[in-house]
Amino acid sequence: MVSATSVRNGAGFMPCQGLYHTPAGTNPKVAFIATHYNVDFSEHYLAPYLAERGYGYLGWNTRFRGNEAFLVLEHALVDIAAGVRWLYESAGVEQVVIVGNSGGGSLMGAYQSQATEPNIAATRGLRLPEAVFDLPSCDYYVSLNAHAGRPDVLTAWFDPAITDETDPASTDWSLSMFNPENGPPYSPEFVDRYRTAQFARNERLTDWCIGELARLDAAGMSDRAFNMYRTWADLRLLDGTLDPSDRPVGVCYAGDPRRANYSPRGIGLTSTCRSWLSMWSLRESHCRGEPHLRRIDVPSLVVQSTSDTGVFPSDAHAIHDALGSHDKSLEFMAGDHYLTEPDGARDEVADRISGWLDGYGI
Protein backbone atom coordinates (compact mmCIF):
# COMPACT_ATOMS: atom_id res chain seq x y z
CA MET A 1 0.00 0.00 0.00
CA VAL A 2 1.22 3.52 -0.73
CA SER A 3 1.66 6.09 2.02
CA ALA A 4 0.85 9.80 2.04
CA THR A 5 4.58 10.51 1.84
CA SER A 6 5.84 7.59 -0.25
CA VAL A 7 4.82 5.57 -3.29
CA ARG A 8 5.75 2.23 -4.80
CA ASN A 9 9.31 2.26 -6.08
CA GLY A 10 10.64 0.99 -9.37
CA ALA A 11 11.43 -2.46 -8.01
CA GLY A 12 7.85 -2.83 -6.77
CA PHE A 13 8.52 -2.15 -3.07
CA MET A 14 5.45 -0.76 -1.33
CA PRO A 15 6.17 1.56 1.61
CA CYS A 16 3.41 -0.03 3.69
CA GLN A 17 2.45 -3.67 3.85
CA GLY A 18 1.03 -6.24 6.21
CA LEU A 19 -1.30 -9.16 6.72
CA TYR A 20 -4.86 -8.90 7.99
CA HIS A 21 -5.86 -11.87 10.13
CA THR A 22 -9.58 -12.53 10.66
CA PRO A 23 -11.87 -15.36 11.71
CA ALA A 24 -12.84 -17.38 8.65
CA GLY A 25 -15.85 -16.01 6.81
CA THR A 26 -16.38 -12.93 8.98
CA ASN A 27 -15.76 -9.19 8.82
CA PRO A 28 -14.91 -8.15 12.39
CA LYS A 29 -16.07 -4.79 13.66
CA VAL A 30 -13.15 -4.58 16.10
CA ALA A 31 -9.55 -4.97 14.98
CA PHE A 32 -6.05 -4.62 16.38
CA ILE A 33 -3.03 -3.05 14.72
CA ALA A 34 0.60 -3.69 15.72
CA THR A 35 3.74 -2.17 14.20
CA HIS A 36 7.44 -2.07 15.12
CA TYR A 37 10.23 0.33 14.21
CA ASN A 38 12.22 -2.40 12.51
CA VAL A 39 10.80 -5.91 13.01
CA ASP A 40 8.35 -7.40 10.50
CA PHE A 41 5.06 -7.63 12.42
CA SER A 42 2.95 -8.89 9.51
CA GLU A 43 2.86 -12.36 11.10
CA HIS A 44 2.80 -11.13 14.67
CA TYR A 45 2.44 -13.95 17.16
CA LEU A 46 -0.77 -12.58 18.71
CA ALA A 47 -2.65 -12.37 15.41
CA PRO A 48 -4.02 -15.94 15.16
CA TYR A 49 -4.94 -16.01 18.85
CA LEU A 50 -7.03 -12.86 18.69
CA ALA A 51 -8.52 -13.85 15.33
CA GLU A 52 -9.69 -17.07 16.99
CA ARG A 53 -11.49 -14.88 19.51
CA GLY A 54 -13.41 -13.00 16.85
CA TYR A 55 -11.23 -9.97 16.18
CA GLY A 56 -9.36 -8.68 13.19
CA TYR A 57 -5.61 -8.22 13.56
CA LEU A 58 -3.50 -6.15 11.18
CA GLY A 59 0.19 -6.94 11.49
CA TRP A 60 1.52 -3.79 9.84
CA ASN A 61 4.91 -2.69 8.55
CA THR A 62 6.25 0.73 7.58
CA ARG A 63 8.80 1.57 4.89
CA PHE A 64 11.50 1.12 7.55
CA ARG A 65 10.89 -2.60 8.15
CA GLY A 66 14.29 -4.24 8.36
CA ASN A 67 15.87 -0.86 7.68
CA GLU A 68 15.79 1.14 10.90
CA ALA A 69 19.15 2.73 10.08
CA PHE A 70 17.19 5.25 8.01
CA LEU A 71 14.12 5.62 10.24
CA VAL A 72 12.54 9.04 10.54
CA LEU A 73 9.71 8.93 13.07
CA GLU A 74 7.33 11.33 11.35
CA HIS A 75 7.25 9.22 8.19
CA ALA A 76 6.79 6.01 10.18
CA LEU A 77 3.70 7.57 11.79
CA VAL A 78 2.30 8.49 8.39
CA ASP A 79 2.78 4.87 7.28
CA ILE A 80 0.94 3.57 10.35
CA ALA A 81 -1.91 5.95 9.52
CA ALA A 82 -2.29 4.21 6.16
CA GLY A 83 -2.97 0.95 7.99
CA VAL A 84 -5.40 2.51 10.46
CA ARG A 85 -7.31 4.18 7.62
CA TRP A 86 -7.48 0.91 5.74
CA LEU A 87 -9.10 -0.75 8.75
CA TYR A 88 -11.72 1.98 9.11
CA GLU A 89 -12.39 2.68 5.44
CA SER A 90 -11.82 -0.63 3.62
CA ALA A 91 -12.06 -3.46 6.14
CA GLY A 92 -15.32 -2.23 7.67
CA VAL A 93 -13.88 -1.97 11.16
CA GLU A 94 -15.67 0.32 13.60
CA GLN A 95 -13.19 0.30 16.49
CA VAL A 96 -9.40 -0.08 16.39
CA VAL A 97 -7.20 -1.28 19.23
CA ILE A 98 -3.53 -0.29 19.19
CA VAL A 99 -1.04 -2.91 20.35
CA GLY A 100 2.27 -1.49 21.53
CA ASN A 101 4.43 -4.60 21.80
CA SER A 102 8.12 -4.89 22.65
CA GLY A 103 10.13 -2.13 20.96
CA GLY A 104 7.00 -1.08 19.10
CA GLY A 105 5.44 0.17 22.32
CA SER A 106 6.79 3.70 22.08
CA LEU A 107 6.16 3.82 18.32
CA MET A 108 2.47 3.05 18.75
CA GLY A 109 2.31 5.37 21.75
CA ALA A 110 3.77 8.15 19.61
CA TYR A 111 1.17 7.42 16.93
CA GLN A 112 -1.82 7.67 19.27
CA SER A 113 -0.31 10.74 20.96
CA GLN A 114 0.16 12.56 17.66
CA ALA A 115 -3.33 11.53 16.51
CA THR A 116 -4.82 12.86 19.74
CA GLU A 117 -2.83 16.08 20.07
CA PRO A 118 -0.25 16.90 17.38
CA ASN A 119 3.01 17.53 19.18
CA ILE A 120 6.10 16.15 17.48
CA ALA A 121 8.80 18.35 16.03
CA ALA A 122 10.67 17.64 12.83
CA THR A 123 13.81 15.57 12.88
CA ARG A 124 16.81 17.92 12.82
CA GLY A 125 17.37 19.31 9.35
CA LEU A 126 14.01 18.10 7.98
CA ARG A 127 10.46 19.45 7.71
CA LEU A 128 7.34 17.78 9.04
CA PRO A 129 5.08 16.40 6.32
CA GLU A 130 1.54 17.79 6.36
CA ALA A 131 0.19 14.24 6.60
CA VAL A 132 1.56 13.84 10.12
CA PHE A 133 -1.11 16.29 11.31
CA ASP A 134 -3.91 14.09 9.95
CA LEU A 135 -3.58 10.75 11.74
CA PRO A 136 -6.81 8.87 12.55
CA SER A 137 -6.90 8.06 16.25
CA CYS A 138 -7.68 4.64 17.69
CA ASP A 139 -10.18 3.64 20.35
CA TYR A 140 -8.24 1.46 22.81
CA TYR A 141 -4.59 1.03 23.76
CA VAL A 142 -2.80 -2.16 24.80
CA SER A 143 0.82 -2.19 25.99
CA LEU A 144 2.31 -5.69 25.96
CA ASN A 145 5.84 -6.32 27.22
CA ALA A 146 6.70 -2.88 25.89
CA HIS A 147 9.94 -0.99 26.31
CA ALA A 148 9.65 2.47 27.80
CA GLY A 149 11.08 4.17 24.71
CA ARG A 150 13.69 3.67 22.04
CA PRO A 151 16.27 6.03 23.60
CA ASP A 152 15.42 4.76 27.08
CA VAL A 153 15.97 1.07 26.37
CA LEU A 154 19.15 1.72 24.41
CA THR A 155 20.59 3.79 27.24
CA ALA A 156 19.59 1.17 29.84
CA TRP A 157 21.39 -1.47 27.75
CA PHE A 158 24.42 0.68 26.91
CA ASP A 159 27.87 -0.50 27.96
CA PRO A 160 29.34 2.74 29.32
CA ALA A 161 32.77 1.14 29.68
CA ILE A 162 33.52 1.54 25.97
CA THR A 163 36.19 4.23 25.58
CA ASP A 164 36.27 4.59 21.79
CA GLU A 165 33.05 4.37 19.78
CA THR A 166 35.02 3.23 16.73
CA ASP A 167 36.71 0.36 18.60
CA PRO A 168 34.36 -2.30 20.03
CA ALA A 169 37.19 -3.78 22.11
CA SER A 170 38.08 -0.58 23.97
CA THR A 171 37.17 -0.86 27.65
CA ASP A 172 37.50 0.95 30.95
CA TRP A 173 37.42 -2.13 33.15
CA SER A 174 36.76 -0.07 36.28
CA LEU A 175 33.33 0.66 34.76
CA SER A 176 32.60 -2.76 33.24
CA MET A 177 29.71 -4.87 34.50
CA PHE A 178 31.68 -7.91 33.32
CA ASN A 179 34.62 -7.17 35.64
CA PRO A 180 34.12 -9.53 38.64
CA GLU A 181 35.62 -6.89 40.93
CA ASN A 182 32.52 -4.76 40.29
CA GLY A 183 29.97 -7.52 40.88
CA PRO A 184 27.40 -8.94 40.71
CA PRO A 185 25.91 -8.07 43.04
CA TYR A 186 26.58 -4.44 42.20
CA SER A 187 26.87 -1.90 44.98
CA PRO A 188 24.56 1.13 45.01
CA GLU A 189 27.60 3.33 44.39
CA PHE A 190 28.60 1.33 41.30
CA VAL A 191 25.01 1.32 40.02
CA ASP A 192 24.83 5.12 40.31
CA ARG A 193 28.19 5.59 38.60
CA TYR A 194 27.28 3.12 35.86
CA ARG A 195 23.90 4.66 35.07
CA THR A 196 25.35 8.16 35.05
CA ALA A 197 27.94 6.96 32.54
CA GLN A 198 25.25 5.32 30.39
CA PHE A 199 23.41 8.64 30.19
CA ALA A 200 26.66 10.42 29.39
CA ARG A 201 27.35 8.02 26.51
CA ASN A 202 23.99 8.86 24.97
CA GLU A 203 24.71 12.58 25.37
CA ARG A 204 28.15 12.25 23.76
CA LEU A 205 26.68 10.48 20.76
CA THR A 206 24.00 13.15 20.44
CA ASP A 207 26.63 15.90 20.52
CA TRP A 208 28.73 14.03 17.95
CA CYS A 209 25.77 13.55 15.58
CA ILE A 210 24.82 17.23 15.77
CA GLY A 211 28.39 18.33 15.16
CA GLU A 212 28.87 15.82 12.38
CA LEU A 213 25.75 17.00 10.57
CA ALA A 214 27.07 20.56 10.70
CA ARG A 215 30.47 19.44 9.38
CA LEU A 216 28.89 17.42 6.58
CA ASP A 217 26.57 20.26 5.63
CA ALA A 218 29.56 22.56 5.21
CA ALA A 219 31.05 19.95 2.88
CA GLY A 220 27.87 19.75 0.81
CA MET A 221 26.74 16.42 2.27
CA SER A 222 23.45 15.66 4.02
CA ASP A 223 24.25 12.77 6.39
CA ARG A 224 26.46 9.76 7.04
CA ALA A 225 26.20 6.28 8.54
CA PHE A 226 28.07 4.97 11.56
CA ASN A 227 28.13 1.88 13.75
CA MET A 228 27.47 1.70 17.48
CA TYR A 229 28.72 -1.22 19.55
CA ARG A 230 28.25 -2.80 22.98
CA THR A 231 24.52 -2.59 23.68
CA TRP A 232 23.84 -5.67 25.82
CA ALA A 233 25.03 -4.36 29.18
CA ASP A 234 22.04 -3.70 31.42
CA LEU A 235 23.13 -4.42 35.00
CA ARG A 236 19.81 -6.19 35.57
CA LEU A 237 20.92 -8.97 33.24
CA LEU A 238 23.49 -10.20 35.76
CA ASP A 239 22.04 -8.95 39.06
CA GLY A 240 18.58 -10.29 39.87
CA THR A 241 18.32 -8.09 42.97
CA LEU A 242 17.95 -5.05 40.70
CA ASP A 243 14.33 -4.68 39.61
CA PRO A 244 13.55 -8.21 40.84
CA SER A 245 11.25 -10.49 38.85
CA ASP A 246 10.98 -14.16 37.87
CA ARG A 247 13.45 -13.72 35.01
CA PRO A 248 16.45 -16.02 34.61
CA VAL A 249 19.65 -14.21 35.53
CA GLY A 250 22.56 -14.22 33.10
CA VAL A 251 20.39 -14.25 29.99
CA CYS A 252 19.45 -11.58 27.45
CA TYR A 253 17.37 -11.80 24.27
CA ALA A 254 20.54 -12.76 22.38
CA GLY A 255 21.72 -15.37 24.89
CA ASP A 256 24.76 -14.83 27.09
CA PRO A 257 25.03 -11.08 27.80
CA ARG A 258 28.83 -10.89 27.66
CA ARG A 259 29.04 -12.76 24.37
CA ALA A 260 26.19 -10.70 22.92
CA ASN A 261 27.70 -7.44 24.13
CA TYR A 262 31.01 -8.11 22.38
CA SER A 263 29.37 -9.31 19.18
CA PRO A 264 28.17 -7.15 16.26
CA ARG A 265 24.58 -8.13 17.06
CA GLY A 266 22.78 -5.42 18.97
CA ILE A 267 20.05 -2.82 18.79
CA GLY A 268 20.93 0.32 16.91
CA LEU A 269 24.05 -1.21 15.35
CA THR A 270 23.93 1.05 12.29
CA SER A 271 22.39 4.50 12.07
CA THR A 272 22.77 7.71 10.19
CA CYS A 273 23.36 10.82 12.27
CA ARG A 274 19.85 12.00 11.51
CA SER A 275 18.13 8.67 12.22
CA TRP A 276 20.08 8.39 15.49
CA LEU A 277 18.77 11.77 16.59
CA SER A 278 15.25 10.78 15.51
CA MET A 279 15.17 7.42 17.27
CA TRP A 280 17.91 6.95 19.88
CA SER A 281 18.84 10.33 21.36
CA LEU A 282 17.52 11.01 24.86
CA ARG A 283 17.68 14.73 24.17
CA GLU A 284 16.28 14.94 20.63
CA SER A 285 14.17 11.88 19.91
CA HIS A 286 10.39 11.82 19.96
CA CYS A 287 10.53 8.03 20.42
CA ARG A 288 10.48 8.27 24.23
CA GLY A 289 7.32 6.77 25.63
CA GLU A 290 6.48 8.90 28.66
CA PRO A 291 5.65 12.23 26.94
CA HIS A 292 3.37 10.45 24.47
CA LEU A 293 1.70 8.20 27.01
CA ARG A 294 0.53 11.29 28.92
CA ARG A 295 -1.62 12.25 25.93
CA ILE A 296 -3.30 8.86 25.56
CA ASP A 297 -6.77 9.20 27.06
CA VAL A 298 -8.52 6.11 25.67
CA PRO A 299 -9.08 2.97 27.80
CA SER A 300 -5.70 1.31 28.24
CA LEU A 301 -4.37 -2.07 29.35
CA VAL A 302 -0.75 -2.79 30.31
CA VAL A 303 0.30 -6.45 30.39
CA GLN A 304 3.78 -7.53 31.46
CA SER A 305 5.41 -10.97 31.62
CA THR A 306 7.25 -11.72 34.84
CA SER A 307 10.13 -13.66 33.22
CA ASP A 308 10.96 -11.05 30.59
CA THR A 309 14.74 -10.54 30.41
CA GLY A 310 14.60 -7.16 28.69
CA VAL A 311 11.48 -5.43 30.02
CA PHE A 312 11.32 -5.21 33.78
CA PRO A 313 8.59 -4.58 36.38
CA SER A 314 9.65 -0.94 36.77
CA ASP A 315 9.12 -0.44 33.03
CA ALA A 316 5.56 -1.74 33.19
CA HIS A 317 4.77 0.41 36.23
CA ALA A 318 6.27 3.48 34.53
CA ILE A 319 4.16 2.93 31.41
CA HIS A 320 1.00 2.43 33.45
CA ASP A 321 1.68 5.47 35.61
CA ALA A 322 2.46 7.67 32.60
CA LEU A 323 -0.72 6.85 30.67
CA GLY A 324 -3.05 9.83 30.66
CA SER A 325 -6.18 7.70 30.64
CA HIS A 326 -8.24 7.56 33.82
CA ASP A 327 -9.44 4.13 32.67
CA LYS A 328 -6.32 1.98 32.78
CA SER A 329 -5.16 -1.26 34.33
CA LEU A 330 -1.91 -3.16 34.85
CA GLU A 331 -1.64 -6.95 34.84
CA PHE A 332 1.35 -9.22 35.36
CA MET A 333 1.40 -12.79 34.06
CA ALA A 334 3.84 -15.68 33.83
CA GLY A 335 5.86 -15.80 30.64
CA ASP A 336 8.96 -14.74 28.77
CA HIS A 337 9.20 -11.73 26.47
CA TYR A 338 7.54 -13.38 23.47
CA LEU A 339 5.27 -15.63 25.57
CA THR A 340 6.78 -18.78 24.10
CA GLU A 341 6.90 -20.12 27.65
CA PRO A 342 5.14 -21.45 29.63
CA ASP A 343 2.77 -23.52 27.52
CA GLY A 344 -0.48 -21.66 27.00
CA ALA A 345 0.94 -18.20 27.71
CA ARG A 346 -0.20 -16.81 24.37
CA ASP A 347 -3.69 -18.17 24.87
CA GLU A 348 -3.70 -16.61 28.32
CA VAL A 349 -2.71 -13.15 27.12
CA ALA A 350 -5.28 -13.32 24.31
CA ASP A 351 -7.91 -14.25 26.89
CA ARG A 352 -6.84 -11.37 29.12
CA ILE A 353 -7.08 -8.85 26.28
CA SER A 354 -10.38 -10.27 25.03
CA GLY A 355 -11.80 -10.28 28.55
CA TRP A 356 -10.72 -6.69 29.05
CA LEU A 357 -12.52 -5.63 25.85
CA ASP A 358 -15.60 -7.60 26.93
CA GLY A 359 -15.86 -5.14 29.80
CA TYR A 360 -16.62 -2.43 27.24
CA GLY A 361 -19.25 -4.51 25.49
CA ILE A 362 -17.21 -5.12 22.35
Where do the model's predicted regions map?
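Primarily recognizes the serine-hydrolase "nucleophile elbow" in alpha/beta-hydrolase
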Residues: 86-89, 94-166
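Catalytic nucleophile-loop/oxyanion-hole region of alpha/beta-hydrolase
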Residues: 63-97, 345-349
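Short beta-strand/loop motif that positions the catalytic acidic residue
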Residues: 296, 302-304
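Alpha/beta-hydrolase
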Residues: 172-291
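Catalytic histidine-centered segment of alpha/beta-hydrolase-like enzymes
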Residues: 335-348
